[in-house]
Every structure is written in structure tokens, then in C-alpha cells.
Amino acid sequence: LQVVSPLKALQRLAERHREAFDIPVVGITGSNGKTVVKEWLYQLLSPEKNVTRSPRSYNSQIGVPLSVWNLEERSEVGLFEAGISEPGEMEALQSVIQPTIGVFTCLGDAHQENFTSYEQKCMEKLKLFKDAKVLVYDMDDARVAGCVNRSAFKGEYFAWSRQRRDVPLYIASVEKREAETVVSYIYKGKEAACSIPFIDEASLANSVSCLAVCLHLGMSPETIAARMAVLEPVAMRLEVKEGRSGCTLINDSYNSDYNSLDIALDFMNRRPDCAGRKRTLILSDIEQAGGAPEDLYGRVARLVAMRGVEKFIGVGPCLSAVQGLFGMEACFYRSTDELLGSGVLDTLHDEVILIKGARSFRFDVLTEHLALKVHETTLEVNLNAVVDNLNYYRSFMKSETKMVC
């Protein structure tokens, strides 16, 4: 099929795919915080919902349709971020995402060189929400609030504020402690509180946006508080480390789902140091995936084979139960501790190793075990010897020669 514009064709195809789903879809835009809000919402919602989200920071004209294409029959909530760098870009992203819930994170300096004013940029971003049912935003940001009032949005305003009580979500107090921030709030006349394991202002604003979405979706304050307290920091990119025995480690031990696995495997294959070296995958059970395990891990096995993985190490009871699906060189362990005790990690040599696991499996200890240790070196300087050396060389100079240090 030949098309005039491959980009427009891709967007149109994703738009039609999106129209097949009648589920809550959260569209997230703003100058900063889009990926953090999306990933935190995933952490908050995924224990009880099948959530489809943008991989990493896929928020561009190409990234958005690729993200929306991941919606499938089992999807119950969609989380997609949209980023623009110049006027005229948001209409296409709105048509693809078609958000029912909008989140505007903040208005900052990013890409300001392509706009005549902050207000122009804000109005352009708000086009994402023209058909949304609900819009979450910070009422205390006067520029954003003013633009929202002038925008084409006709739905429910879910503003939050630390200053005004007449908003849907009033932040009554914020208490910053040594390693956490306690947020007390009033929603629908009821007082509640939650804490986040961060103390910076950006994390506070991002967490309140997540709080608003969860409240709108009907999550109880008690459930929100329990999940907010264990929010994990967002790893913005895959971490590459030098490993022992000539290995290269790709650490993605922050989350585990099918789509992010595909992206991580693609990343591994594109690395120039992968050529001619064995590709090894250490994977944990995929949690909160829903559906039959045989179907899920059958898809995983086919993906792993297609991506050229030559050695597979599976960790978890679910993977151990379906090990017959994996045809390449493979071994399986019911827990991370069992893998560590097996000694198999010490047999890996000159391989590119992708470490991909759900947080509960503590795969960070595997990365620590496999990483090349860097030992501290202490340099001691004998200043008396330095002075002696200086005086020695000065003795060869003429008396009128000056020195500069």
C-alpha cells in the first residue's frame, strides 16, 4: 500500500485503532513531568487494572501512534503522554489519543523558542483536551488557569490548589520530613492524607496530579495512601554498565511488562557492542498482566526468540511452570535468591545481558552481583618531598629567575 505521507498514514491507522476502545484514557501533557506522572499512575492503577501506557517517553508524532497501537482487548485503562515542540502539532496527537481524562502537569521553558509567548504554548498544549471529559490542572499557576478558561475544553474542571478551598481538590497542608512528604487534602468535603517518599517540589506536584486522577477514577483514599507511600522513582532510560568477565549489563529492573520488554530487547540489539556476542536475558515473572499465563508467556517466548536471545534465565514461579515454551538455552529459578545461590551468574562470560524484572523480585541485587566492581584508590602526597624537589630544580636556575605556580 503506497501512501503520500507515511506519518499521516500511521497516525490515521492508530486513530482508528483507538476508536475501538471505550475505556478511560488519560492524556498527559505539559513542559515537564509527563513521563513521571504516567509511570506513577501506572504504579498506582496496575495492581487492579490492566493498564496500557506509552513506553518510556514515546510522546512525539511517531511515538504517540506507536503507543496507542499497543491497546488490546484486555486493556482497561490507557495512559499516554503527548509532547510538542512547535505550533500545529497537537491536533494530530489529540486525534490519536482521544483522551477522556486530561492531565496538564506544568508550564515551563521547554521549546519556548518556537512560540511567541508562554500563553501560545499553553493554548497549543490544551488542544489535547478539547473533547476530554475531565481536566486535571494546577489552579495556582495563573497562566495555566487563565489559558484553561479560554480554551475549547467543555468538560469537568478538576483543579487542585494549595491556596483556594473552592476547588475540587484542596491541598490543606504539606509537611516535608527527612525522607517523605505528607500531603493532607480535602476532596468532596472529606479530609484525608497520603505520603510520598520524595521531598522535592516537582515530585509533590506530580503526585498531586496522580492523586486527582485516582480520586476521579473512584480509588479509595486508603488505597491511594498505601500505594503512594511506596512509589518508586522513575528510571528515564535504560542503564548500561560494564559487567564482570567481559560482559555488558543493560539494567531495566524497574518494571516488567510485555511492551517494555520488547523495547528493551530492541535497545539491546541496536547496541554496537552486541555484534558477535551472546545475547542473554534475565527475566522475572510479569506481574499484574491478567489473562492466562500460557498465552502471556507464549507471546514472551516468541518475542524472545524473534529478538535473537540465545540464553534465557527465568525467575519466578510462573516462568518456572511454563519453561517448556522456551526453546533456546534456558534455565529457571523460582526466586531471585535461588538464582543467586545457583552459581549460574558466575558462568556468564563476554555476553550482553539484559536484566528485566518486576520490582518485587529485587533484580537490583543481580545487577550489583554482575557489575564490575570499582575499587577506591587513595593518593597520598608528601608535601615535604614536593618542596625538596622544587628547591632542587631551583638550584639550577639563575637568581633573577622568577617562578609562577
Positions of predicted regions on the chain:
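Acidic, Mg2+-coordinating active-site environments of NTP-dependent enzymes
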Residues: L1, I101-T248, R270, G276-R277, ...
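Phosphate-binding loop of NTP-binding sites
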Residues: Q2, L7-M139, A145-E156, D346, ...
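ATP-dependent carboxylate/acyl-activation modules
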Residues: I28, A235-E239, L261, L265, ...
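Short glycine-rich anion-binding loops that position phosphate/pyrophosphate groups of nucleotides
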Residues: I84-P87, G108-A110, D141-A142, N255-S256, ...
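Glycine/threonine-rich flexible loop motifs
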Residues: Q112-S117, L261, G290-E294, D364-V365
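C-terminal helical cap/extension that packs against the catalytic core
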Residues: S253, K278-E351
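A charged N-terminal "starter" segment
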Residues: E351-V352, R362-C405
